[in-house]
Amino acid sequence: VNIFIATVATLVIGVLPAWAGPLHQAAKDGDIARVTQLLDQGSDLSELDEAGEPALIIASLAGHADVVALFLDRGADIEIRNKGGLTALHAAAYAGNLEVVKRLVAEGADVNDRKNFYQMSPLHGAAEEGHTEVVAFLLTANADVEATERNGYTPLTQAGWRAHWDTAKLLMEAGAVCQKAELVGEPLYKECTKRQ
């Protein structure tokens, strides 16, 4: 499941839609001077764009650690959610932005947050995309290796589906177990148990 499909598309294209506010555009661009100016002029850090994304999530997904740090220093709610209920930590983990992930965790972001439509933890997104360094960091921060999302899938299942075997191996070393064959599919189960 591509949990940030609209936002990822805007990052790839390079511009946010016309209805995105200037703070959201500056966050996407990583324009720290413009972000500072807009905040000094009273821009609202809790405002969502019309796609339902707060500027903190956009900056986290884009990997702009300096913008994320500025938002947090200016009082951004670290647990602000997009319309799907995902946080900045979900976004940074999904995108593989390790520096941003570290900052968010250091500031108190919940590594086991699953209070979203998908019931996914940040570890699910990092594992799905094969971001092994992010997975390793989240595990050291006590992320639940056996957390299940709304369909019952674990981070290991998601890493295996995408054939991210280095990530899957790391998850297994951290205690993840292969799920039943009928849940994950026979080929994945065979590969998983062979590598365990």
What are these regions (language model features)?
Residues 19-54, 58:
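N-terminal segments that cap or nucleate solenoid repeat domains
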Residues 52, 85, 118-119, 152, ...:
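Start-of-repeat signature of ankyrin repeats
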Residues 6-15:
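Bacterial N-terminal signal peptides
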Residues 177-196:
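Terminal, low-structured helical/coil segments at or just beyond the last alpha-helical repeat
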Residues 25-30, 58-64, 91-97, 125-131, ...:
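Ankyrin repeat A-helix N-terminal signature
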Residues 49, 82, 115-116, 149, ...:
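Ankyrin repeat boundary/linker residues
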Residues 31-39, 64-72, 97-105, 131-139, ...:
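Ankyrin repeat structural motif
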